[in-house]
Amino acid sequence: METRRMLTALLLGSGLALAAAMPSVAADKVKAGVVRSMGGSPNFIGKEKGFFAEQGIDVDIVFFDSAQPIAIAVASGDCDVGATGVTAAFFNLASQGTLRIVASGTWERPGFQSIGFLVSNQAYAAGLHSLKDIGGKKGAITQSGTPLQYAIALAAEKYKVDYNTIQVLLLQSNPNVGTALTGGQTDFAVQTVVPAYSVVNKGGAKLLGWEGDELPPTQNEAFFTSTKMIDERGDVLKRYLVGYRKAMTYFHDAFADANDKRRDGPAANEVQEIAAKYLGQPLEQIKLGTPFFDSQGRLVEKDFVELAAWYKAQGMIKDVDVKAMIDRKNAIMVKPK
């Protein structure tokens, strides 16, 4: 009996030593490009909660100052995936067969905060109190051919303002837009929630309203990847998407009910703390604005078709086949709500 115990102990010890000596399987790395905004939340949550690690994925989050460079980075291979507003540059690159839309990003919906309209204190004092007053004014955004510029056009259409009378200032980065607002070099601006509140909370501008409340519901942000990623690392992409969609569900349930109406769930504070950590912003500021994410990142094709049509009307892109730009093997489609 004693001999048996000794042999068992020896075998167990050898097994443990062998297991310790064996190299662990390295996680597959994925570089995700995002703007420093709440639109990157699924990546923040997936990384922080271990949803990507569960799938054997190690995500490296890369921050950009604006949306356009993310499409270029993904197309060139500097990033594997991107999540941001769908720009004219995206459509131009996708039309060459380099990029594909895989899932939705933030949606513009009533009660949620994603894209905001701000007015400088000087312009407000001069009478610019609502979006119906933007005709003939200067409006600042980061770059041309973005959903931020599209939002100005949609506001002009709703309030019967001639879009061509608005002088759109292209200031390249959110800090530049904030400086222009504070200094009165622009009358109004369009920014996502985090940089918007960065200016408003310092008294540099006033909030006119949110696109989700002011304009019809629309979807103009997306999660996308390169055709090279789909073709050469398809298994990695699928596993990444499992973690990404799990994170989207976690975000959705933290701030929306089963009917997609705004409410705080049990995980609301936790998600806001995660966002504050990754964005380097005070928690109090993060709590001021919450975007909407569909629980599964479903896509509304019509919204992207209309966005592309507007870019084309402005001479920013040529004819593009939006349907061909969607990775239908991985995307989940849905009709407008």
Region spans (language model):
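Short, glycine-/small- and polar/acidic-enriched structural segments
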Residues: 26-161, 167-171, 187-193, 209-210, ...
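Bacterial N-terminal signal peptides that target proteins for export
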Residues: 1-11
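Secondary-structure end/capping motifs
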Residues: 231-316
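Sec/Tat signal peptide C-region and signal peptidase I cleavage site
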Residues: 18-26
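Conserved C-terminal helix/tail region of periplasmic/extracytoplasmic solute-binding proteins
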Residues: 304-337
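Bacterial N-terminal signal peptides
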Residues: 9-19
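Periplasmic-binding protein-like
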Residues: 107-116, 204-229, 233, 241, ...
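A residue-level marker of the well-folded mature domains of exported/periplasmic proteins
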Residues: 61, 170, 179-188, 199-203, ...
